[in-house]
Design a protein with these regions (language model features):
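Non-catalytic cap/lid and distal C-terminal segments of serine-dependent acyl enzymes
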Residues: 21-293
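Glycine/small-residue-rich hydrophobic helix-like segments
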Residues: 214-221, 492-572
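Blade/loop signatures of beta-propeller domains
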Residues: 290-311, 439-440, 499-514, 602-604, ...
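Beta-strand-rich domains and repeat architectures in extracellular enzymes and scaffolds
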Residues: 296-300, 310-347
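Beta-rich, blade/repeat-based domains predominating
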Residues: 317-337, 364-390, 405-430, 439-444, ...
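A short loop-to-beta-strand structural motif that recurs across blades of beta-propeller domains
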Residues: 347-349, 390-395, 443-446, 487-489, ...
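Short loop/turn segments that connect beta-strands within beta-propeller blades
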Residues: 351-355, 397-401, 449-453, 493-496, ...
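Blade-level signature of beta-propeller repeat domains, shared across WD40, Kelch, NHL, RCC1
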Residues: 574-616
Length: 616
């Protein structure tokens, strides 16, 4: 025992050294070298004005200008969060001299701080709010406020070509850099994150999933982390970075990584920074463009539906009309005609299967607001308006016929089935559109026919404004979107005996009528407040929902499988065009369309279609 005890004590003394963080010595590229032209550094500060997304914040910044910099030409540049990191100015000097990277302008920004009100108060530290957020707020600040301000102040001309712009950061600065490029790939396409905070502080833990669901973006990304990275209340940095790398690889991104045994610091990232820069800017002299899915290896589910097409804006008959338009509602018929109109009634336009847009009919006389538009079983557009006739069928040019006068109009309207049942409308808004629902209020769905105000209605699980409504392809379920929550509600359509005292019972051929039953939340959309709009389905049973994140596409089980980004926020979506194979979105002042491999279903105008069951 006397010989064993000292050995045990000696082992315990060495245990801390066994777990010590490895050293990461800098290479020659990160140290000043003789005979290498040196850039210059400008130091300044910036105070955000009232009206900024970060009002009152003050921040220091530094600007690196490469040797021989020409201010008259648009410059490639790289933005860093948390000021100067990774020995970047020295690395820039050395790599620019070797022509490994272009002559970059370096912009090193500190996070914002609002000064304390007095000596007994704390400042408002904005770093986490600015950096850890997954919203586009920081990219808005950077591109709309900060960069234009320093360009004007220092006489700079930064390139607006996204292939000429990179962005980087460490820890929370890393997630900030990634999100700036994610939201604005039209301005940034090269990203380096060291020990990136892809964890649950302000929602970044959802990014590995969103990377798989969103259509791949044209980004080149390098990630660094280590086994000794943070493991805290909000997540495990080491595991989160690996999940990000796996998701980016799965989605077909141009991605690289460096894993090590380091902790939550900039040591490893600083060591590899010169090689990271070479990788990010490789081929910059011969092929600088970065493309989405460059090797064609992406497993993004959306390629099976929309391919690699792009959105195309429609040209309205008069360009002057578009500036003041709020086109939030669309509908299509089985011929492929797509009808759309201004929210405050003006002419109804039609996009025909031949691709031409023409004025179809004037606005409804006396109407104050158009709430929704659908096509009836004959293919004619039907609108629901307030301040006018209620629900109105619109024919060519001047033929309008009143169909019904509901007590309230709705943003959900669609054609339904045969017989006398031609319309289904979701009733769910207050008389004052801005008045919130109170406790005890309910949203509801009601069936209407041409002869009666209401045939059957059902309350929904939550009180919320209905923003969209459509039938399943087999016409046995109604899908409803509600504006201020992230759920899709399903309502079953069943049959019930027609009441014997119903004066219209003689018109029912089989003694039954449709009834609504078993309403429940069915699908959940991505995003805490996705600002949901209209929705539609295709023959495979996929459900397409217009949201502020883009078009979210759910499978037959209600799961969001992929998200199609849109040029602007879409308020409605439908299939139209030749063979109902084009996807249309209404984005306020613009209607866009995109070719797809799918074939849409228009509610109530086609025989029921039974889709295949959902897969994993």
């Amino acid at each position: 025992m006397r010989s064993i005890l000292p050995l045990s004590i000696l082992f315990l003394l060495f245990v801390p050294f066994l777990h010590a963080e490895p050293e990461f010595p800098l290479t020659a590229d990160s140290q000043p070298l003789p005979n290498v032209p040196k850039g210059t550094i400008l130091k300044d500060n910036y105070t955000a004005k009232e009206g900024s997304v970060f009002p009152g914040t003050q921040r220091d910044y530094q600007i690196y200008l490469p040797a021989g910099f020409d201010k008259t030409r648009p410059a490639a540049f790289m933005v860093f969060q948390d000021g100067v990191i990774y020995q970047a100015p020295v690395v820039f000097d050395n790599l620019i001299a070797k022509k490994d990277i272009p002559p970059l302008v370096g912009i090193f920004i500190k996070p914002g701080v609002v000064p304390a009100a007095n000596d007994n108060a704390l400042p408002r530290f904005n770093r986490s709010y600015e950096y850890d957020s997954v919203t586009p707020t920081y990219s808005q600040f950077l591109l709309d406020e900060f960069l234009p301000a320093i360009e004007a102040k220092h006489g700079l001309k930064l390139s607006t070509d996204p292939n000429h712009a990179a962005i980087s950061g460490n820890s929370s600065g890393g997630i900030c850099a990634f999100m700036a490029a994610w939201h604005r790939p039209d301005r940034f396409r090269r990203v380096f994150t060291g020990v990136g905070t892809y964890v649950g502080i302000h929602g970044a833990d959802q990014l590995p999933v969103l990377v798989r669901k969103f259509e791949p973006k044209p980004l080149r990304v390098f990630l660094q982390s280590g086994t000794g990275d943070n493991n805290l209340y909000c997540g495990d940095w080491w595991m989160a970075n690996q999940m990000m790398e796996r998701s980016l690889t799965w989605a077909g991104y141009d991605v690289n990584h460096a894993w090590g045994e380091g902790g939550h610091n900039a040591k490893h990232a600083s060591q590899i920074f010169p090689d990271v820069m070479r990788w990010l800017w490789r081929d910059w002299q011969t092929n600088i463009e970065i493309k989405a899915n460059p090797k064609g290896e992406s497993k993004w589910k959306g390629y099976e539906v929309v391919g690699d097409g792009v959105w195309h804006p429609l040209q309205l008959p008069s360009a002057n009309d578009a500036a003041a338009l709020r086109m939030h509602h669309m509908a299509a018929n089985q011929n492929g005609d797509v009808f759309f109109a201004h929210e405050f009634p003006k002419p109804v336009w039609r996009h025909g299967p031949d691709g031409h847009v023409n004025s179809y009919a004037p606005g409804v006389r006396g109407a104050h607001k158009l709430w929704s538009i659908a096509c009836d079983k004959s293919g004619l557009p039907v609108v629901c308006v307030s301040g006018g006739e209620g629900i109105v069928r619109i024919g060519e040019i001047d033929n309008a016929g009143v169909m019904n006068r509901p007590s309230r109009c709705s943003e959900g309207l669609m054609a339904f089935g045969g017989g006398d049942i031609t319309l289904l409308t979701g009733m769910g808004h207050k008389q004052d559109d801005h008045e919130p629902f109170a406790e005890g209020d309910h949203a509801s769905v009601m069936l209407l026919d041409q002869n009666r105000t209401q045939q059957h209605s059902i309350f929904l699980p939550a009180a919320s404004i209905i923003s969209g409504i459509c039938l399943s392809p087999d016409q046995t379920q109604i899908y409803l979107a509600q504006r201020d929550n992230s759920f899709i509600t399903s309502v079953l359509i069943k049959t019930r005996p027609t009441p014997p005292d119903d004066p219209f019972a003689a018109g029912q051929k089989d003694g039954t009528e449709p009834a609504l039953a078993e309403a429940q939340r069915f699908g959940e959309l991505e995003g805490s407040k996705p600002e949901t709009g209209g929705l539609c389905v295709d023959t495979n049973g996929w459900l397409y929902v217009a949201t502020s994140l883009g078009i979210q596409v759910c499978d037959q089980a209600g799961r969001v499988n992929f998200i199609i980004p849109t040029p602007k926020q879409p308020y409605d979506v439908c299939f139209g065009g030749k063979d109902l194979s084009e996807l249309f979105i209404a984005c306020g002042d613009t209607i866009y369309k995109r070719p797809t491999k799918a074939k849409g279903v228009v509610s109530g105008q086609q025989p029921p279609i039974k889709p295949a069951p959902p897969k994993l």
